[in-house]
Amino acid sequence: MKNVLIIGLGRFGIHIAMQLNQLGHEVMAVDWKEERVDKVLSFVTNAQIGDSTNAEFLQSLGIGNYDICFVTIGDSFQNSLETTSLLKELGAKLVISRAERDVQEKFLLRNGA
């Protein structure tokens, strides 16, 4: 069983959260929109509303305690990149970030994904 953090609860993030829950993993889900967090409460271990580009908020989650951190933010590549970079700075063991284009993948890989 892994302890997993998922940041970004659009369709992709919710799908990953559901699958990991079904596999028996502990899932912490985060999004800045309350209605998205409400959608996952029934099948994740814990969920919080918050801004993942805020280092203090991320630090409060205890980033080093997660085996894997997924960044599934789809509506803002800038936020995805900032979140990925902050996660690595805060001691994330493994960061897997969503990229829609090759150039995004390159930026994410250079910044901690």
Residue ranges and their predicted role:
Residues 1-113:
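Cytosolic regulatory regions of ion transport systems
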